[in-house]
Amino acid sequence: MNKILLYCRQGFEKECAAEITAKAAEREIFGFARVKDDSAYVLFECYQQGEAEKLLAELPFSELIFSRQMIVVGELLRDLPPTNRITPVVGMLTGVVEKGGDLRVEVPDTNASKELLKFCRKFTVPLRASLRKDGILLNFESAKRPVVHVFFIASGCCYVGYSLPANNSPLFMGIPRLKFPSDAPSRSTLKLEEAFHVFIPADEWDERLASGMWAVDLGACPGGWTYQLVQRSMMVNAVDNGPMAPSLMDTGQVFHQREDGFKYRPTRNNNYWVVCDMVEKPVRVANLMADWLVNGWCREAIFNLKLPMKKRYEEVAQNLAMIHEKLAQNGINAQIQARQLYHDREEVTVHIRRVWSATPGRRDER
């Protein structure tokens, strides 16, 4: 198996391909990306045998912005016989995976694949039984063992491979299943909820998303992101010239500041969070967020960068590099992560956390 298969958002295949090519080259692993427009996946084929497995192990999945899942696969299985699709799949995995912890039979995230997904659900049960019989899967699910993936791109055609449990998305198809709250002011609320799940470990929520914290939402109207902060029992300064949802104002936790988010200067010195989802050029938002960190106006930030029509990966990379340089020049140590979330559109979401620079692992007390 000498290929890396990456799931991505439909329409962002070129960005996904550019990113994996660059990340592989940084590790002196070379190959070429096979890209089909609007397919919702990318195949990166390594020139040397064994390098796909090496890349899967060495490239942190958390570093990838445009990928929803990363697995190593072999050649495409074509024209699987309708009466016996299982045998070729088992044959592809024999000697490659032993005692896998889970099985996911998946498809690209496109409208055309929805019908195929129904077949995948039915196919999973007999395939799992066969893989367990042959020792490719354990007789029980284990989060500590490799995940077996069967990725159907068409009826009778699939890629077969595996991902590593500590370096993959734990989600089926890499997609979170979040329910839109009926009382939220806008669907954008799901972006911030997903960002919390992606960027903040679940066992740190009570500390880093704690009740009673102060937060600032720049460009808050009508309050989709403010809603998530209120749900975590935070106090929020919502900055926007537009109106906020009355339901949020009635909580007593929201203070509406009718100002331009770029001109607003906080009056409190204990804001833990700043969040921002403004429709603006990405370089302006990136600079603004870097300034908030440099000035010590917050400890963590989550914000969206709206992407141009062309050279989207390059745009994101340049803005992240600028933020990193600006923070470094001011002696600020920070963790920076970015991801095109499932609920994002033509944008990526960035998370920055100040960390204590004097002692590794110590929290930033400013």
UniProtKB/Swiss-Prot annotation:
Its EC number is 2.1.1.186. InterPro entries: RlmM_FDX, RlmM_THUMP-like, RNA_MeTrfase_FtsJ_dom, rRNA_MeTrfase_M, SAM-dependent_MTases_sf. The lineage of its organism: Bacteria, Pseudomonadati, Pseudomonadota, Gammaproteobacteria, Enterobacterales. This is Ribosomal RNA large subunit methyltransferase M. Catalyzes the 2'-O-methylation at nucleotide C2498 in 23S rRNA. The keyword Nucleotidyltransferase does not apply. It is an enzyme of class 2 (transferase). One of its GO terms (cellular component) is cytoplasm. GO terms for molecular function: S-adenosylmethionine-dependent methyltransferase activity. S-adenosyl-L-methionine binds at residues 188, 221-224, 240, 260, 277. GO terms for biological process: methylation; rRNA processing. Belongs to the class I-like SAM-binding methyltransferase superfamily. RNA methyltransferase RlmE family. RlmM subfamily. Monomer. Keywords: Cytoplasm, Methyltransferase, rRNA processing, S-adenosyl-L-methionine, Transferase. It catalyses: cytidine(2498) in 23S rRNA + S-adenosyl-L-methionine = 2'-O-methylcytidine(2498) in 23S rRNA + S-adenosyl-L-homocysteine + H(+). It is found in: Cytoplasm. It comes from the Bacteria. The active site is at residue 306.
